[in-house]
Swiss-Prot record:
This is Deoxyuridine 5'-triphosphate nucleotidohydrolase. The keyword Magnesium applies. Pathway: Pyrimidine metabolism; dUMP biosynthesis; dUMP from dCTP (dUTP route): step 2/2. Disulfide bonds: none annotated. Keywords: Hydrolase, Magnesium, Metal-binding, Nucleotide metabolism. It catalyses: dUTP + H2O = dUMP + diphosphate + H(+). GO terms for biological process: dUMP biosynthetic process; dUTP catabolic process. It comes from the Bacteria. It is an enzyme of class 3 (hydrolase). GO terms for molecular function: dUTP diphosphatase activity; magnesium ion binding. Its EC number is 3.6.1.23. HAMAP family: dUTPase_bact.
Length: 156
């Protein structure tokens, strides 16, 4: 089924000076859930990530995520599989009221140094709906069949 009406919310991006010349974050296939984020590192000074080390990598953009949504920063499977490069704090949450540059906390879990070059696709962002709950304190938890069983209590 094809839907001909574009009712998707708009994601406004503000390009920062270090993002000049970079492609906009984009969905790389028709069915992609996440848009790829690119590294806004200095072209003359790529970032080399040694094994076991981590670094905060700029994207060059501020994301104005609509209220009622969040941005989830996630690893790219190819970088993880081929090089051991992943995102710490994954998924990292970008709140709708955050107005700073989106950065990616990359870690090298591989055995070799990895060079992050300008414009390289380093992570993906999934925009997802969120619900803020009304919080109330209760004297006791309600009864369920499962009860307090956790961490494998329903089987492995």
């Amino acid at each position: 089924m094809t839907i001909h009406h574009d009712l998707r919310p708009t994601l406004n991006l503000i390009r920062l000076a270090n993002g000049e010349g970079l492609d906009l974050p984009a969905y790389e296939s028709k069915g992609a859930a996440g848009m790829d984020l690119r590294a806004a590192v200095d072209e003359a000074a790529p970032l080399t990530l040694q094994p076991g080390k981590r670094a905060l990598v700029p994207t060059g953009f501020i994301f104005e995520i609509p209220e009622g949504f969040e941005g989830q920063v996630r690893p790219r499977s190819g970088l993880a599989f081929k090089h051991g490069i992943t995102c710490l704090n994954s998924p990292g949450t970008v709140d709708s009221d955050y107005r700073g540059e989106v950065k990616v906390l990359l870690a090298n879990l591989g055995d070799e140094a990895f060079t992050v070059e300008r414009g390289m696709r380093i992570a993906q962002m999934v925009i997802a709906p969120v619900t803020q709950m009304r919080v109330a304190e209760s004297a006791a938890a309600s009864e369920t069949t499962r009860g307090a069983g956790g961490f494998g209590s329903t089987g492995v």
